A protein has these predicted regions:
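Electropositive phosphate-/nucleotide-binding environments in soluble metabolic enzymes
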Residues: 2, 35, 65, 108, ...
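Residue-level detector of flexible, active-site-proximal loop/helix-junction positions
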Residues: 61-63, 89-91, 156-159, 172, ...
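Charged/polar, solvent-exposed surface patches and flexible loops
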Residues: 6, 10, 14, 73, ...
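The feature marks non-catalytic terminal segments
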Residues: 186-241
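Catalytic subdomain that performs nucleotidyl-dependent activation
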Residues: 54, 133-210
Length: 241
């Protein structure tokens, strides 16, 4: 965990993600990425020179078979406030509207519910669990499927909602996330959603895996190019415009 904490701290500092006095909500989906983000920030908050507070926040969409009680217990052990918001999104998407392509609507409704909850609690900063591999895959998806160079940014300010998104796990590789989740015995919540899975991202994962046999430093080269090029928002120390 010390290695991951070091990577998270460097990412936070490189992109000036956290200021003194911040309250940072971690969007907890129950997956390994968001739970590790929560764990890392909770530990970082104990010694980081800019004092900040961490809260966990989950939008419970009503998917049958999903329980976040284990996450609640974990938050108590971490000493982190846990905000749970129940919204009948599953019912709307699958039972009322019977969407053929439900993921887009579900994501839109969850973002809206999250924004409302943050506003109600006076929180203006949220940490998301995207990691190193997510960034590389998103970059390639943008290039291959959209014909452009693009990716989410380490720090994104959403002017419409006055919310800042940060991604402190960006220097952490997926294999490190997997290993840490096992070692820490994180209370991962299995997602039984009938639409769970992202075909295009899986295609890109398989493409990268097939190329890494010949080019083992492929992901490192792509990630480095994103910072050196740099993509908008990716230049370390603000060197991105």
């Amino acid at each position: 965990m010390q290695e991951i904490l070091g990577l998270v701290r460097r990412c936070v500092e490189d992109y000036d993600m956290i200021q003194a006095g911040d309250t940072v909500a971690v969007g907890v989906s129950g997956g390994k990425d968001s739970l590790l983000t929560l764990t890392a920030l909770a530990r970082l908050s104990r010694f980081y020179p800019k004092p900040f507070r961490v809260v966990a926040m989950t939008i419970e969409v009503g998917t049958p078979g999903m329980s976040f009680d284990g996450v609640a217990d974990y938050c108590r052990a971490l000493g982190v406030e846990y905000i749970r918001v129940s919204v009948p999104i599953y019912e709307v998407v699958f039972l009322e509207r019977r969407e053929k392509n439900p993921c887009s609507l579900c994501a839109k409704l969850r973002r809206g519910a999250l924004s409302t909850a943050m506003n109600e609690h006076g929180i203006r900063k949220i940490a998301l669990g995207h990691h190193y591999d997510d960034a590389v895959e998103t970059m390639l998806m943008s290039l291959i499927f959209e014909g452009r160079l693009g990716c989410f940014q380490p720090v994104t300010y959403l002017s419409r909602t006055d919310v800042t998104q940060i991604r402190p796990l960006l220097y952490v590789k997926e294999r490190q996330v997997v290993n840490a989740a096992k070692r820490l015995e994180l209370p991962i919540v299995e997602n039984p959603c009938p639409a769970n899975g992202e075909t295009r991202r899986q295609e890109i994962k398989e493409l990268i895996a097939s190329l890494e046999g010949r080019y083992p430093d492929l992901k490192q080269k792509i990630f480095g190019a994103m910072q050196r090029y740099p993509l908008y928002g990716w230049g370390v120390g603000g060197e991105d415009k």
